[in-house]
């Protein structure tokens, strides 16, 4: 039996994280071990806490530690504006920019014929219910400028046409770009220059 079995298992798990390959995972784990009391133990404790408390907001799909997130419960938010994003990382990117003061709806992905992802596999039915029930006046389609993102935007627009003002992000978002990788200034410029969809 290997004396590094548990360490190897940790390296294998770390290598499954986005942006970390086997070599990066190995270096990260070795660094954590060297900084046991400063990093490893607090990280393990925090991971355990997050594993027990993290959940998706029942209303919008954001991630937090309560059933309904702080954004959905904030009375200072503009109730009539709903920004639709693909995933939580996109929501967090929009929040970092500080430009949007409305509410969000996280789809949980995009429509994809290749991956057999239809509207029912995403939070699209919930979105279509939220618009009339919450008195939404504008839906901002802040989806990534990919083929699947634009296909999803068109599907949503077709289903909401005539019910609400539909806009999408404009300048600043490159074709093929993803919101999570954009700087705050680019997101701000794109949000300010949104246009009818």
From Swiss-Prot:
InterPro entries: DNA_Rcmb_RecR, Rcmb_RecR, TOPRIM_dom, TOPRIM_RecR. Residues 80-174 form the Toprim domain. The keyword Zinc-finger applies. Keywords: DNA damage, DNA recombination, DNA repair, Metal-binding, Zinc, Zinc-finger. PROSITE patterns: TOPRIM. Signal peptide: none annotated. A zinc finger (C4-type) spans 57-72. Coiled coil: none annotated. GO terms for biological process: DNA recombination; DNA repair. The keyword DNA repair applies. SMART domains: TOPRIM (SM00493). Disulfide bonds: none annotated. It comes from the Bacteria. It holds the Pfam family Toprim_4. Belongs to the RecR family. May play a role in DNA repair. It seems to be involved in an RecBC-independent recombinational process of DNA repair. It may act with RecF and RecO. This is Recombination protein RecR. The gene is recR.
């Amino acid at each position: 039996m290997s004396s590094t079995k548990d360490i190897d298992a940790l390296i294998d798990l770390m290598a499954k994280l986005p942006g970390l390959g086997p070599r990066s995972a190995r270096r990260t784990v070795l660094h954590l071990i060297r900084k046991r009391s400063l990093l490893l133990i607090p990280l393990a404790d925090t991971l355990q806490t997050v594993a027990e408390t993290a959940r998706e907001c029942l209303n919008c799909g954001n991630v937090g530690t309560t059933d309904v997130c702080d954004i959905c419960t904030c009375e200072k938010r503009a109730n009539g504006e709903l920004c639709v994003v693909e995933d939580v990382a996109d929501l967090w990117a929009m929040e970092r920019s500080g430009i949007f003061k409305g509410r969000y709806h996280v789809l949980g992905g995009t429509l994809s014929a290749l991956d057999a992802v239809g509207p029912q596999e995403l939070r699209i039915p919930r979105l279509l219910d939220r618009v009339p029930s919450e008195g939404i006046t504008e839906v901002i389609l802040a989806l990534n400028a990919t083929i699947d993102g634009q296909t999803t935007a068109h599907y949503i627009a077709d289903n909401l046409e005539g019910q609400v003002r539909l806009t999408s992000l404009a300048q600043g978002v490159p074709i093929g770009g993803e919101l999570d990788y954009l700087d705050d200034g680019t997101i701000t410029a794109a949000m300010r220059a949104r246009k009818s969809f």
